[in-house]
């Protein structure tokens, strides 16, 4: 066993953490709909777009802190027992998975605004990821999908280069922005 094996395992385990994250935060709006606490906040003068940004920011912050903590523990563990220099594309691979998580957060916010049920948010988020994942099976579409970022562990061993993921990174950032814009637009018109 070496640091490369440990990092490969780290990137295989991140999807589990992301699934748990989705289950924890899919109710971020739906609980407010059920208890009508969102109406109280809005009647006190808080803008709807600020509510959307606040919810996104909370999830973004929790994902970033949790992810960086897991990364730091793994990095320290590998530095203590082995040499991290064997993993050549470690930083880009880490950023790609983090960005993939940010896209998931954008989807959670979008579906939380679109539907009023926890199950609907889970199905919408999971269905979107599954749909994009299936699209990535087409060789010509692979480099354009956010799910490409899940395969960035191949950067560790040098079978792919950072340039192979450039378009996917830009499209993922664009999709996060689109999710937020659509969420704010729908939230501004939504009857609560």
Q: What feature does the model see in each segment?
A:
Residues 1-28, 52-119, 125, 154-173:
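Secretory targeting signals
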Residues 1-8, 126-192:
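Terminal transmembrane helical anchor/hairpin motif
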Residues 24-42, 192:
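Transmembrane helix boundary and interhelical loop/hinge segments in multi-pass membrane proteins
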Residues 32, 76-84, 114-118, 134, ...:
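Membrane-interface elements of multi-pass transporters and channels
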Residues 33, 37, 68, 122-123, ...:
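Alpha-helix N-cap and coil->helix boundary residues
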Residues 48-49:
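Alpha-helix N-cap/start motif
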């Amino acid at each position: 066993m070496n640091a490369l094996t440990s990092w490969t395992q780290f990137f295989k385990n991140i999807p589990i953490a992301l699934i748990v994250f989705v289950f924890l935060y899919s109710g971020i709006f739906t609980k407010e709909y059920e208890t009508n606490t969102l109406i109280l906040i809005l009647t006190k003068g808080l803008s709807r777009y600020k509510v959307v940004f606040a919810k996104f920011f909370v999830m973004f912050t929790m994902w970033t802190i949790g992810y960086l903590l897991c990364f730091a523990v793994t990095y320290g563990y590998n530095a203590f027992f082995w040499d991290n220099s064997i993993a050549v594309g470690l930083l880009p691979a880490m950023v790609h998975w983090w960005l993939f998580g940010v896209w998931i957060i954008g989807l959670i916010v979008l579906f939380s605004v679109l539907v009023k049920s926890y199950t609907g948010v889970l199905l919408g988020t999971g269905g979107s990821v599954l749909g994009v994942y299936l699209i990535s099976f087409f060789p010509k579409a692979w480099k354009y999908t956010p799910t490409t970022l899940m395969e960035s562990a191949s950067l560790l061993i040098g079978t792919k280069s950072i340039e192979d993921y450039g378009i996917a990174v830009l499209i993922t950032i664009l999709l996060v922005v689109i999710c937020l814009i659509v969420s704010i637009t729908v939230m501004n018109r939504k009857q609560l």
